[in-house]
A protein has these predicted regions:
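Core segments of cupin and vicinal oxygen chelate
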Residues: 34-74
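Mid-chain, structured segments of secreted extracytoplasmic proteins
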Residues: 64-109
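Short glycine-enriched loop/turn motifs at secondary-structure junctions
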Residues: 26-28, 85-90, 127-128
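Generic short beta-strand
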Residues: 32, 65, 133-136
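N-terminal beta-strand motif that seeds the catalytic metal site of vicinal oxygen chelate
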Residues: 20-40, 91-95
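Vicinal oxygen chelate
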Residues: 38-40, 93-140, 151
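Bacterial Sec-dependent N-terminal signal peptides
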Residues: 1-24
Length: 151
C-alpha cells in the first residue's frame, strides 16, 4: 500500500511539475534596431533605396526614426548611442521580394554597389536551392541581403 501511495504521489508530482514547465512562448520578430551615426542620412537611404515608409517614432526620443518592413515588422534607426559597432557580412538584414530582378535594376540605377556572398561585384548569387540573392551596404556599413524567396 505504501509503495502504491508513493507511486501515485510521484506520478502526480511529475504531472504537476510538467504542467508548470509546459508554458511555452511563441515569439515573432517585431523590429530590427540599427545603431547609426547620422539618423537622417540613414533614413534617407532606407526610404530611397528600399522604399520603406516612415512611421511615428512611438518612443518620442530625438535621434530615432522608425520604418515599416512589412508584415507588422519595423526597422528602428537609432543615433543616440555613440559606441562603435563591429559589422561583418554574417550580421545582415535579409529581405525577400517578388520583384527581385527589378530591385537589382533599381539599385544599379541608383549606383549602389552590390555583390554576391563571396564578394564579387555586380554579381547575383544563386544558392543551391535556386534562390537569387545580392548583398550591399547602408551608409553605416550594415549589410543588407535582398533575395528572391518571395517569388
Amino acid at each position: 500500500m505504501k509503495k502504491t501511495t508513493v507511486l501515485f504521489i510521484a506520478i502526480g508530482l511529475t504531472i504537476f511539475l510538467q504542467a508548470q514547465d509546459s508554458t511555452t512562448f511563441k515569439f515573432s520578430v517585431n523590429h530590427l534596431a540599427l545603431s547609426v551615426k547620422d539618423v537622417n542620412r540613414s533614413a534617407e537611404f532606407y526610404s530611397k533605396v528600399l522604399m520603406l515608409s516612415e512611421i511615428t517614432n512611438r518612443s518620442k526620443i530625438e535621434g530615432i526614426r522608425w520604418f515599416v518592413l512589412g508584415d507588422g515588422r519595423e526597422l528602428h534607426l537609432i543615433s543616440v548611442i555613440k559606441e562603435n559597432v563591429t559589422i561583418n557580412k554574417a550580421l545582415h538584414l535579409g529581405l525577400s521580394t517578388a520583384n527581385f530582378d527589378a530591385f537589382v535594376k533599381r539599385i544599379t540605377t541608383l549606383k549602389i554597389p552590390y555583390s554576391d556572398w563571396p564578394g564579387k561585384s555586380n554579381t547575383v548569387n544563386i544558392r543551391a536551392d535556386g534562390i537569387k540573392q545580392i548583398f550591399f551596404q547602408d551608409p553605416d556599413g550594415y549589410w543588407i541581403e535582398v533575395n528572391s524567396v518571395a517569388q
